[in-house]
Amino acid sequence: MAETTAPKPRVLVADDEQVIANTLAIILNQAGFEARAVFSGEKAVEMLESFEPDMLISDVIMTGMTGIEAAIITRERRPSCKVLLFSGQAATADLLEKARAQGHEFEILAKPVHPTDLLAKLRG
């Protein structure tokens, strides 16, 4: 009898700092996830249909579309997709408050995110 393995959870990582996005994707791939890195909120939204992520991990402050805007669109288009945001910017609080006022709640991690903490969140 052939043994079937469960598909790897798909994680889309969005950060306009390419080194951070790529590094997180490498860490996640090595930890047993199928991860892809994109470098803008717009690209994250574009990838929703073709990659079909189980989770979006996004920086909040990015050039163009913010991570919060991408997260809201992600939840609208893929309601089962979990969202985790991270940021090292103080301005994040204002953006989160605006999203909260519109009925959107997001979990946020402080940047830099230690890989152990990130993996614990993803597996928890």
Regions found by a protein language model. Give the residues of each.
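The short loop immediately C-terminal to the conserved phospho-acceptor aspartate in CheY-like receiver
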Residues: 17, 60-61
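Active-site beta3 strand of CheY-like receiver
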Residues: 51-57, 84
